[in-house]
């Protein structure tokens, strides 16, 4: 086997260093050593050592050439003549790792088949594993009979080997493995723990795509036939899956199989108890009554003598405390004793759980205990502590001083990027949400950037300092920290510091002369970006730049959120041809468009006119449509195009004619662009037009129609219908559509169409114009700043009952769909089991009116959802309209 470790004494360091037995081995030398496989008198120990080295090389990523692999493979097959059991097991490993080709497999198959029928169970089990890894589907059918017998073999080692091989083969030959269901079901009843475990895993994988079959499997096994603790843990997971799926389809009542999960809490095996407790705590919408038995057993484990049980219990309780803190309060006394646990991971989880469940009076005591062990735990656990402190501070804002001091102290200690970022993010959130914490928080951040090794965090703090520092009682005290960055840091941080100085100069008149002096010094910086920024800001603050004609313009330029999606700007800049005319940033589309999943899949159809832009870069869509519509005389006088919708399908897939419609919204008009495709080779369509019935849309009046002269097979074309509406009116309605045309037969052999045609029509799906069509999805980079910059007088607040909903997520999605706005900062995602949620939306209403919405959702009953809607906009009337849209939605 492998040589023993070599221990060498280092005279200089006077300490022992341990070297790997494989240190310095080379592939060529090992391949030479492999010649021992050909010796007439095999040395089993020597052969095992060589195979170990070969396996090491393979697992380290060394590759063998085709010739080398073939030579090693054939040499290895000669070792089957040895009777040494240890060497035989190494041979199995070597063959499996070499992954021989189909031709080579045939050579070794006979030896493996012989071992598979051997009287030695260890040979049989290993031969099955190797065979199933190297054979193809053709050879599999030849040994299928042996594998089915092995599954029900009396020896558990052989049976487990066959079942594990079945799990592997299910990925490559699922149809073959599915024929083994009867044998696998028999193995599930085995008394051997591992056999039952592997059999249950394989049986579930065979049936996993059939929900009814999985439900029946769980029903039959929860009656008590499973004795293996490992298999019981699997069964608990499958039961949880069935409960989740059934809960989605039921409207209430008792959960199926919950009694089984509860009974597992009384199992003899600790792993089963923990698995059941974890499963109960992770159920969707779990109630306090359902949690109680799980919390009780977890509380018992907190005082266990086994560290792994204490860790598992406190980690589960930590997760529960995030959603059901009151349910965990009974465990607080037990968890306080764990703060001094020798295992720092357990102590960390205990104290963070207490932070989530504790009251205001216990904060100072917990802070003192936490200080003692922060240096002893890994960064990942430190991040957990920081997040818990942030939540606690927001929960008890009066305790911000002690919590902020704790954060600033650990910020000065050693730590990685993610850990430091978590602390900085927490301090920034506390400054934003607790006004009294602003001064001390900004001071701590300034001290941190004096010795910060992370460029990202330095620029983040400088940006935040530029927004919040000028609003403090003494802004001048921050200038020294900012200018130090210009002198001492790299180019990226220096550029950020220049921008921060300009923000102070724009908002604090008394500091402007000093800022001018500092910015002029930056004109001699060695970096282009720093010099350019300094030049721009000097002209801007001095009133020389065109953007800085008024103080409001300057502040908007410096502090306004960058509302243009970067991907749109990038595309426009790529299309911009350098000329004497400057680049017009107003030409860049503001709308944030996400491509639907269906559009990402290849449909096999040709793109339809300008709609083909959807398959390319998304931001060019509006420009393409605007160019097309302005070239049509009937629509040229409609003004600037506000928005173009995504295509709405009006026909089923695979029908004779494919039609979708794009809604183009103007201030006083709506143009419907019907993209048509003829999918019948034997037909030519002429004079194609869509007849639109607007009887259910009385706020619209048809003003123009543009027909399509000819629509050959598989050659997309467009027809248009334009409607007029009152400017400033949120006109909505439903339109019914009929495709009318003259159809002419086409000779397939010549491609010639008949002279005579027949008038025909084709019924299309109805189309709706909704309130969301008048809203552009435009994101903001910083919602809080954008909200505060809007006039509070424009704010309108009201509360609404949304009725019974399946979940908060469904309610959030429905309101976003009604408004057609862009979710900000990922707030469209609702955490599972949440009973409240805040969603932030932004957009531009027709007329280029910026709108911001803050939605607060809460569950007022079992499934009753209440919502508070706050709107701010550039026009108070639009704020009122947003409320009307929601009220009527």
UniProtKB/Swiss-Prot annotation:
This is Coatomer subunit gamma-2. The coatomer is a cytosolic protein complex that binds to dilysine motifs and reversibly associates with Golgi non-clathrin-coated vesicles, which further mediate biosynthetic protein transport from the ER, via the Golgi up to the trans Golgi network. Coatomer complex is required for budding from Golgi membranes, and is essential for the retrograde Golgi-to-ER transport of dilysine-tagged proteins. It is found in: Cytoplasm; Golgi apparatus membrane; Cytoplasmic vesicle, COPI-coated vesicle membrane. Signal peptide: none annotated. The keyword DNA-binding does not apply. Belongs to the COPG family. It is a peripheral membrane protein. Oligomeric complex that consists of at least the alpha, beta, beta', gamma, delta, epsilon and zeta subunits. Residues 596-617 are annotated as: Disordered. HEAT repeats lie at residues 67-102, 103-140, 289-326, 328-360, 361-398. One of its GO terms (biological process) is protein secretion. Keywords: Cytoplasm, Cytoplasmic vesicle, ER-Golgi transport, Golgi apparatus, Membrane, Protein transport, Repeat, Transport. It comes from the Eukaryota. GO terms for cellular component: COPI vesicle coat; endoplasmic reticulum; endoplasmic reticulum-Golgi intermediate compartment; Golgi membrane. One of its GO terms (molecular function) is structural molecule activity.
């Amino acid at each position: 086997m492998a040589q023993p470790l070599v221990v060498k004494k280092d005279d200089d360091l006077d300490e022992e260093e341990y070297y790997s037995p494989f240190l310095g081995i080379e592939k060529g030398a090992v391949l030479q050593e492999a010649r021992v496989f050909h010796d007439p008198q095999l040395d089993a120990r020597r052969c095992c050592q060589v195979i170990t080295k070969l396996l090491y090389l393979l697992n380290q990523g060394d590759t063998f050439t085709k010739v080398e692999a073939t030579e090693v493979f054939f040499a290895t097959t000669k070792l089957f003549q040895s009777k040494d059991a240890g060497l035989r097991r190494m041979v199995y490993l070597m063959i499996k790792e070499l992954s021989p080709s189909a031709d080579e497999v045939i050579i070794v198959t006979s030896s493996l088949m012989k071992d598979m029928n051997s009287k030695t169970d260890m040979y049989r089990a290993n031969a099955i594993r190797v065979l199933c890894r190297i054979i193809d589907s053709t050879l599999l059918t030849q040994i299928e009979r042996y594998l089915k017998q092995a599954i029900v073999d009396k020896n558990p080692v052989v049976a487990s080997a066959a079942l594990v091989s079945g799990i592997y083969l299910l990925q490559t030959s699922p149809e073959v493995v599915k024929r083994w269901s009867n044998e696998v079901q028999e193995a599930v009843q085995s008394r051997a723990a591992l056999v039952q475990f592997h059999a249950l895993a394989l049986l579930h994988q065979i049936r996993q795509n059939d929900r009814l079959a999985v439900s029946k499997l769980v029903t039959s096994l929860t009656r008590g036939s499973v004795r293996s603790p490992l298999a019981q843990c699997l069964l608990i997971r499958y039961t949880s899956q069935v409960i989740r799926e059934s809960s989605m389809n039921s409207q209430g009542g008792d959960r199926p199989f919950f009694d089984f999960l509860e009974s597992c809490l009384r199992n003899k095996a600790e792993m089963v108890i923990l698995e059941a407790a974890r499963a109960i705590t992770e159920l969707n919408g779990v109630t306090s009554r359902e949690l109680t038995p799980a919390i009780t057993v977890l509380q018992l484990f907190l005082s266990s003598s086994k560290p792994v049980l204490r860790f598992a219990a406190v980690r589960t309780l930590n997760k529960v405390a995030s959603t059901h803190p009151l349910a965990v309060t009974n465990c607080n006394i037990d968890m306080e004793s764990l703060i001094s646990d020798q295992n720092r991971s357990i102590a960390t989880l205990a104290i963070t759980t207490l932070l989530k469940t504790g009251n205001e009076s216990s904060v100072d005591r917990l802070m003192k205990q936490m200080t003692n062990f922060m240096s002893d735990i890994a960064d990942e656990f430190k991040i957990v502590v920081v997040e818990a402190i942030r939540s606690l501070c927001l929960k008890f804002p009066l305790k911000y001083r002690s919590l902020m001091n704790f954060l600033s102290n650990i910020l000065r200690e050693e730590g990685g990027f993610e850990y430091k970022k978590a602390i900085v993010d927490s301090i920034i959130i506390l400054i934003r949400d607790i006004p009294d914490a602003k001064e001390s928080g900004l001071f701590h951040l300034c001290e941190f950037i004096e010795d910060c090794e992370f460029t990202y965090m330095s620029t983040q703090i400088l940006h935040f300092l530029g927004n919040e520092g000028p609003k403090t009682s003494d802004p001048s005290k921050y200038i020294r920290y900012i200018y130090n960055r210009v002198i001492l840091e790299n180019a990226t941080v220096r550029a950020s510091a220049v921008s921060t100085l300009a923000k102070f100069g724009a908002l604090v008149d008394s500091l402007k002369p000093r800022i001018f002096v500092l910015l002029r010094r930056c004109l001699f910086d060695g970096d282009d970006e720093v010099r350019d920024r300094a030049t721009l800001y000097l002209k801007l603050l001095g009133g020389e730049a065109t953007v800085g004609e008024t103080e409001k313009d300057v502040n908007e330029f410096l502090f306004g959120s960058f509302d243009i999606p970067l991907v749109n700007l990038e595309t426009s800049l790529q299309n911009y041809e350098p000329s004497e005319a400057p680049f017009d940033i107003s030409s860049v589309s503001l709308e944030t468009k996400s491509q639907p999943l269906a559009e990402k899949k290849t449909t096999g159809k040709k793109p339809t006119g300008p709609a083909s832009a959807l398959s390319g870069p998304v931001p060019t869509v509006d420009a393409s449509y605007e160019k097309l519509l302005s070239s049509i005389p009937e629509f040229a006088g409609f003004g600037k195009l506000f928005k173009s919708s995504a295509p709405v399908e009006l026909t089923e897939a695979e029908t004779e004619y494919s039609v979708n419609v794009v809604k183009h919204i103007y201030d006083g008009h709506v143009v419907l662009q019907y993209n048509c495709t003829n999918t019948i080779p034997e037909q030519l369509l002429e004079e194609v037009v869509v007849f639109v019935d607007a009887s259910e849309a009385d706020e619209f009046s048809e003003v123009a129609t543009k027909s399509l002269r000819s629509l050959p097979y598989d050659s997309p074309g467009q027809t248009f219908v334009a409607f007029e509406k009152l400017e400033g009116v949120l006109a909505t309605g439903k339109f019914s559509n009929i495709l009318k045309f003259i159809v002419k037969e086409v000779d397939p052999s010549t491609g010639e169409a008949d002279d005579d045609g027949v008038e025909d029509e084709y019924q299309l799906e109805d189309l709706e114009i909704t309130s969301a069509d008048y809203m552009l999805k435009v994101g903001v980079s910083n919602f809080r700043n954008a909200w505060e910059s809007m006039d509070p007088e424009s704010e309108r607040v009201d509360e609404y009952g949304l009725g019974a909903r399946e979940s908060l997520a469904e309610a959030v999605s429905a309101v976003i769909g009604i408004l057609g706005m862009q979710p900000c900062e990922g707030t469209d995602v609702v955490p599972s089991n949440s009973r409240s949620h805040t969603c932030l939306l932004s957009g531009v209403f027709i007329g280029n009116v910026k709108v911001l919405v803050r939605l607060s959702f809460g569950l007022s009953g079992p499934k009753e959802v209440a919502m508070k809607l706050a709107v701010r906009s550039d026009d108070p009337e639009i704020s009122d309209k947003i409320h009307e849209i929601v009220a009527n939605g």
